[in-house]
Amino acid sequence: MSTKNIFFVSFLLICLIPILLSAQDISVHKFIGKTRHDVIKKYGNPVHQDNSNPAMICMFYQTKTNRMIFVSDKNGVYQSEATANYNTESKARNAVDNFISSSVEDGFAVDTVTINDFELSKTGVKADLQMSENKITKNFEVSVKARRSED
């Protein structure tokens, strides 16, 4: 292979591997209190960023099956949301189970509200995890909404 081809392939791999590895990662609650730089380091540059209000800087990420929003101020990320779509209930349920297991390992307490609705908390962070079915598309959506808390 020529040097140009090796360079091109290397560049593609460097750009695509982080995207592929985090394609369905919805653990946005772990970024509460972290800096915008930490978010960009994990997910790359946002698709859109709104810097019009320094007290509420918003970063938006989107792929074909995943949407994420991070809201931050000078003290770090204080609100985050993620939504991932799955074509089967079992894949969505696995995502929920993995999310909960990973969160418990990170020190979060989990409270089951219903079979598809969970509240997670840890000092300084509260999050809601929900799974729902889109009756029209027959897809399943897993969403996380996290926020900084004062406890």
Residue ranges and their predicted role:
Residues 23-25:
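Boundary of Sec targeting at the N-terminus
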